[in-house]
């Protein structure tokens, strides 16, 4: 078992950029710059490259057991101690599987998998459903599903590939929402510091509820819950813009720099500061590999010629 969900299609439906060759950076209205990684040539004003090469996301997570014991899954000794427990999952390279856990585990046993900033992790639940947890996210789940339903609890962002079982429906609780799932692939983004909770459906069907309000999603549609107004709405979206992260890509479509760097800071575990307030609103479109070093991302952004970066460890100052 490796640390990437098996059988998922690669990003294919975004037509605006060539994944192999071109990144378009937009600032303001009507201006832009193209970069060809194959040749290393910029068409437009050439930027000055500064900063270090910082690593991309790592397969790192903390597992909290039912008795409160915390296991750092990077720690070999901790993993060995975990393997001796009755409810022990199988620990692979960047992945955790509960398929082999026996039914003798206590009914009330719940575990929590927490992925820190700069990390990501794959979880295979006892029923074979697969979850890819993004950085700064956590999922609480039963070690064994014994009830007439399968229910997990999410904070942050995750991509789900749920095993179909009509006799035992699958639910994801994301405060204050409940998402009911059939055999389905979909993503949920529910970071506490963000106003919107996004449920993006790739295949199958889901039902999203907030109290008495509920919406049904078909593929390529997204449920948007606004925490500030408690309203629930549905829109048609290009799912790749919201789910490309599971395939190891960073895609932003005409987004403010502040939003882009907040997301990248979460992926690379960086603290972002701004020496000039106006640069927060500069708009960019980016399509790059998520696991490139951060230095490569800086090169692309600096190539626009209107911003620079000062790097000190994991602290980035935007100038």
Predicted feature residues:
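Positively biased amphipathic helices and basic secretion/translocation or surface-docking motifs
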Residues: 1-18
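A residue-level detector for the "anchor" residue at the start of short, highly conserved motifs
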Residues: 13-20, 30-319
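Active-site-proximal cofactor/substrate-binding loop regions of enzyme domains
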Residues: 26
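Gram-positive cell-envelope targeting signals
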Residues: 1-4, 22, 36-37
